From Swiss-Prot:
Binding site for ATP: K222
Protein's name in the database: Tyrosine--tRNA ligase
Record motif 'KMSKS' region, residues: 219-223
Key word Transport present: no
Family: Belongs to the class-I aminoacyl-tRNA synthetase family. TyrS type 4 subfamily.
Coiled coil: none
Length: 332
């Protein structure tokens, strides 16, 4: 598989594809993903992303920014920086266990020790507006009302853009919820006459509980353990959560169990996937094949749930095993 195909694989959006294709053949491509350490991660963070990035780590330099300062601003783990750092070690261990062994793991607190970082921060801030920063607050799951009570939240989008510039990356990875920050970085880069970062946006996984309305997306969140599969969950936990999950028949959109099959298992399991169907065994060799079979009713929700729980337990096992013996009571 060519590099550009690996980048496009299992992505919701690439901004822009033309910019991405111009990077092909470049020998020293640098990329990053920023993750807030905030406790025990769920599968969208610590299974999907490390496996995605592991596929390109031989071709591209990958940096995982353990965004401890960002998590502190966002009041993750009550803003306790020591506890956030412990959460960052959990991220590093799980990412490496899931295959991302060649990445550089960098702390935001190391970046901010540099006066050059803060010079870039000020240069970046001078090329943005308060209105644009407010529009970017959803990247941290916040809004203007939250920021009015805590001014530090206004710094967050500018810090994220500064991270991109300071690390001098060609490519930024993240969920669709990071789009505002990446677009802000591209706009400010144009004003600075510097390279625009290629923004690669992955899918967000829906809450296992489903969404009340199709236009009201609720993502999987570790703050609600019953909405998410955590990397510490054992087989019985995974089975219980998947069996209780929203999974309407013949509907893949807004179906969290179908999303796990489409965005984690089929792209990254790496083995043949066979599932019981109404007309016999179905080989799920592509997302398109799964979509068609499920929407036609050839795969029943109960069979899908059984297959997803079984394979997901296997895929979570490396991350789960990497945390054995650690005291995780502070994150329960």
């Amino acid at each position: 598989m060519h590099l550009i195909e690996k980048i496009y694989k299992n992505t919701r959006e690439v901004v822009t594809r033309e910019d991405a294709e111009r990077l092909e053949g470049k020998s020293d491509i640098k990329s990053y993903i920023g993750i807030e350490p905030s406790g025990i991660p769920h599968i969208a963070t610590a299974v999907m992303w490390p496996r995605k990035l592991a596929e390109i780590q031989d071709d591209i330099k990958v940096t995982v920014l353990l965004a401890d300062w960002h998590a502190m601003i966002n009041n993750k783990l009550h803003g306790d920086l020591d506890l956030i750092r412990k959460g960052g070690e959990i991220l590093r261990k799980t990412f490496q266990a899931e295959g991302l062994t060649k990445a550089d793991y960098v702390w935001a607190s190391d970046l901010v020790d540099s006066s050059e970082y803060w010079r870039m921060f000020i240069d970046t801030a001078k090329r943005s507006t308060l209105k644009r920063v407010i529009r970017s607050l959803p990247i941290m799951g916040r809004n203007e009302t939250d920021a009015e009570k805590d001014f530090s939240m206004y710094l967050y989008p500018i810090m994220q853009v500064t991270d991109i510039f300071y690390l001098d990356v060609d490519m930024a990875f993240g969920g669709m919820d990071q789009r505002h920050a990446h677009m802000l970085a591209r706009d400010i880069a144009e004003k600075m006459k510097r390279k625009k970062v290629v923004s690669v946006h992955g899918f967000l996984l829906s809450s296992l509980k489903g969404n009340a309305r199709m236009d009201n997306f609720v993502k999987m969140s570790k703050s609600d353990p019953n909405s998410a599969i955590l990397v510490t969950d054992h087989m019985e936990d995974i089975e219980r959560k998947i069996n209780a999950a929203y999974c309407p028949p013949q509907q893949v959109e807004g179906n969290p169990v179908a999303e796990i099959m489409k965005y984690i298992i089929i792209p990254y399991y790496g083995k043949s996937i066979e599932i019981h169907g109404s007309n016999g065994v179905i080989n799920l060799d592509s997302v398109e094949n799964f979509d068609q079979a499920y929407q036609r009713g050839e795969i029943q929700p109960a069979d899908l749930k059984h297959k997803v729980a079984t394979i997901l337990n296997e895929m979570v096992e490396p991350a789960r095993r990497s945390l054995e013996g650690l005291d995780l009571s502070e994150f329960q």
